[in-house]
Structure formats: C-alpha cells, structure tokens
Swiss-Prot record:
Species annotation: Kluyveromyces lactis (strain ATCC 8585 / CBS 2359 / DSM 70799 / NBRC 1267 / NRRL Y-1140 / WM37) (Yeast)
Function, as annotated: Transcription factor involved in regulation of the PUL gene cluster that mediates the formation of pulcherrimin, a red iron-containing pigment composed of two cyclized and modified leucine molecules that acts as a siderophore, a chelator that binds iron outside the cell for subsequent uptake.
PANTHER family linked to this entry: REGULATORY PROTEIN GAL4
Annotated DNA-binding residue span(s): 3-29
Phenotype of the disrupted gene, per the record: Impairs pulcherrimin production and subsequent red pigmentation.
Gene Ontology terms for molecular function: DNA-binding transcription factor activity, RNA polymerase II-specific; RNA polymerase II cis-regulatory region sequence-specific DNA binding; zinc ion binding
Pfam families: Zn_clus
Name of the coding gene: PUL4
UniProt protein name: Transcriptional regulator PUL4
Amino acid sequence: MACLECKKRKQKCDGQKPCRRCTKLNVKCIYGTDRRKDKRKIKDGSNMFIFKNQTLCNDKINGIVPHPLSHDTITTKETWEPSYPLFSDDINPADIISMENTDGSIPLQFDLDFTSLESCDVNDFLRLIGDTFPANDADTLDMNQMGGFNTPSISHNTQDDKSQIAIQRNRLIDVIFGDDSHTPPGILREHIFELSERHEDLEALDFDDNGKFLLSTVLCLGALTLRKRELLNRDSNQPSTNGIPEVAAGAYKYYTIATDLIPAVHAAPNIDGFCGLVLMANFMTIMIPLEGQLYLSNNALEVAVALNFHKRESYDEMIVSNPAQLGVFLLFWNLWCSSCMLATLLGKQPFLTLDNISLPPPHQMQHTVSSSPLSINFMRLRIQLATLQTKIFQRLYVYGSLNKVLFQEIETELSLLSTQISNMKCYPIYDEGLFYRSKVLMLELSCLKAHNAFLLYRPNLIQKKSLHAVDAAKHIILEIWSHYTKQFPKNEKDLVDHLDWNFSYPLRTASLTLSISCVILQKYQQSLNFLEEYGIFEYNLALGVLNDLIQVVPIEKRLINLLTVSRTTVEDANESNREDSLRFWTNMLMC
C-alpha cells in the first residue's frame, strides 16, 4: 500500500513507515485507510465504528451482526460492538454514535474510504454528479489529459499558462461568491483570492495545507455548480460532446487534490481547514450515501470541537481579535443542525448535543456578522427544530421514557415552533432575489418540522394509536410537490435559474423527507386491506417528484429503490438492510 505522498507524486512506494521517499524528502509519511483491514478504531477502550468498505464508488454497505446491549452498558462505558442494527420498535443502544471527544482532547481520525478516488476513474466520478461521456474516452483518460483545468507544476509553466489558470480559478470562485446575499458563512472572497495567488501550484509542498485544502474545496464546489448548471440547461435532444467536459474535469482534479490533503488538515486543523471540511460535507451529499454524509459531518464537528468553536470563549476572543471571521460560527451552527438531522433520521445519537455548546446562537451574536435578517431568523428556528429533534430522539428512542406530561410538553413546543414558521412564511418579501431564497428556506423549515413529527409519532403509528405521522407526511409531500413538480414548468426554470453553490443541501433534505413520508404512507397502507397498492394519492405524488429530483442528484435513486424493495419475509428485510440508509424507518414495515 502506497503512502499519500507517493500517490500524489504517482511514484512507487516501498510501503515502509516512513517510506524511503518521504524520509529523503523530509516530509511526514501518511498512509490512508487500508481497505483490507477492519475499519473499527479503538477509542478510550471502546470500538468506535468506522463504516466498513465504504468508498465513493461503492453501491453497497456491508454491515456487521449487531450485539444487543442494555442501556446500562452504555452509561458505564463498557466495550461494545457498534454495527448496522436491524431496528425493532426501539433503538438498539449498541448503534449509538460515541459521545466521547467533546473537548477535543483525543486525537482526531478520518476514514479516507469516504472520499478516496483510489478505486474510481473519471467515469465513476461523472456518473455520481449526473454527467456522462462516451465510454471509449474514459478507457484512455489520464489525470493529466483532462481539458484545460490541468494544474501541473508552475515551474514548467509559461506566464500565459499562469494567467490562464488564474482566469479559470477566478471564474470558479465567482460562482461561489457571485451573490453577495448568499455566500458560504465564514469564508471571505478576498481570502480565497489571496489563497489562489499564494498557491499557484496546489500540489507543491509547503506548510499551508489547510489553506490549499480550503482553496481546492472552493474550486471543486464552484466547478460542480457550474457543471450542474450546464447539464440542467442542456437541450436533451442535443448530442453529447466528445471527451470530458472541461468543468467536470476541473471538479475531478480539485477534488483529488483536496482529498489528498485531508490527513494533513486533520493532523493540524485551523479555520481554513474547518471551512474546507464543511464545504466538502456540502458537495459530498451528491456523491456518498447518507451514512457517509453523517460521518463526514461528524468529522468536521470534531475539528470544530478541537478548535473550540462550540465555546462562548472562542467567540468572545474572535470579536476582539478578528471580527471579520465571526461568520465561521454561523458555519458551525449550519453544520451542527445538518448533523443532528442526519443522525436522528438514521436512528443515531447526535455527536454533539446542545448541552455541550456554549456558543451563542446567531440571533444573539453581534451585528458584525454579515447576514440578512431572513437568514438569521431561519437559523434561529432551524436550531430550535434541531434541538427539539434531538430531545425527541433521546427521550423516546434512547432512554425509552416519555410519559404523558412530557409528551404533551413536546407537542406544545412543536406546535409553537409551527406557529413561528407560519408567521415567518407570512413576512412580506418583494425583492426578487430574496423572494426565491425565502422559498427554499421556508421549505427547509417545513421539512425539519415534519421530521420532528415523524419521530414523535412513529411509535403511535406502529401501534395504530394515531395517524399524526400520516397527516404530517401527506402535508409535507404536498408542499414539496408544489415546489419541485415538473407539472408546473416554472418550477424547473426556477431551479435552473437560481441554482447556486448550496444546491445539494435543499435537494438532499427534500429527497430524504419524501422518502420517509413514503415509508410512513406504506405503513399506513398496510393497515388498509381494502386499499390497493399505490392507492394513496400523496404517495404517487412523492414518487413522481423523487424521480424528478434524481435527475439533479443521481445518488438519491437509492432512496427510490428502498421504497420498492420486497420485504415480504424477514430474510428479505435482512438482505435489504445491507443497502438501506433508512432502515430505521423501513423496518416499521416488518412490525
């Protein structure tokens, strides 16, 4: 197995630790994850599960047979074997993600299986981003033969080559920062341009791996966004061009550079490295399954914890020392909310709870943070919904105790949040850009509200005590359908016209929400012997929209496959669990 430095230089490696080449160059010798070994890591005497055999190109997730443990086992921190559980009505405590390392004192680890392109060619990469090209071009394609986005050593470039690379980079950076009202929080355009000038050769050896990593992720996300716009604007009757699209080649190139830098970033992270990891968690939503997305988000959170971004003291210090960087705390909150949503909907314990965060929420931060009131109010409600979602999951599925009084308190809290969301939707907006941005944000809040209802009323649906979950599923399907259905042509035009760097997150949320809603309706349909299969109107609407959304994010086809897989026997259910990202929900169908 070659070390990362030899891989980057495309040289043979002797496999020693350190290898001869790294010793000669006097650089740190780092090896990626060995796919021949079990990916479980020992952490404080416990096995911390690292998803096994998971690569960018894997279509299947291989699980391990779970070992049921009592809740006492977790509280006493005894050794347990985390796994992919076959969920029953309750959560298997053995599947809860480790809550250790919340103070950043333990060395961080990163599983490169989630991001490595070692076993992938360009064809795999393009397939994941929804791109295609003639197969015979893929067979002979080499990394240094891809379009105009080559990044060879600058020492061999003419001045014209340098100018061309600068123009290409500026174009991709402008894709990310073109709309001043919606740019990645905590990342400044001027800083990215400065990094671009400083690192003319992204593959050169220097001491700013975090800066190169951030620049590479920005350029990759810019290229992905640009290519997605090109694909959505392309005439379906127009024949495909020969060769690799230039922008797609650039995305592949910058992605490879970024992933090679991950070990160095994790070894000594700073603000640039954290921002780069959050951006990578963003665009990886179109490339890896939900479990991988959760793991990637948790790794970024671990870096944030190591940098103390979750603490009030760090915020207070930055107000004085570097107020221009306060947006990084908004980035932290965005990441935390996304992580909570993914964790609870996948039947996992969130990595970091609100009790361990002393950082003030966005609406309590000083006005030096450059964000619109709409975004700040959205973040306030989003944090409240994520907090409630975590509370529901812990009380109902981890501790298994939710008496009538507490249940009614949570219902009241959810009702109050629903009222606040309704009031926010009624706020008058007449600016065109803000109008379309608000539509996306309001739909996101509606989805998050539905997630809370799904978790809260899931047991009642299984026990046939109430249909609150069914009602929530029907309502959110109609709202998502009205936003994305191609039966209304303007929806498709709006998606193309307003597609920006953050396109993957809203589409991921919509697809995930529709899929869970469909499972809930399937469970409801099982109780109606007189109703034929696919006889629920909203279910058919949801499937139609999901089929439209996978044209933009192809990996979400997995979710559609989960809705149609046979689960007539326990054996069928066990087999489907190997690929089932939503087994926490689909296993309801076997109850």
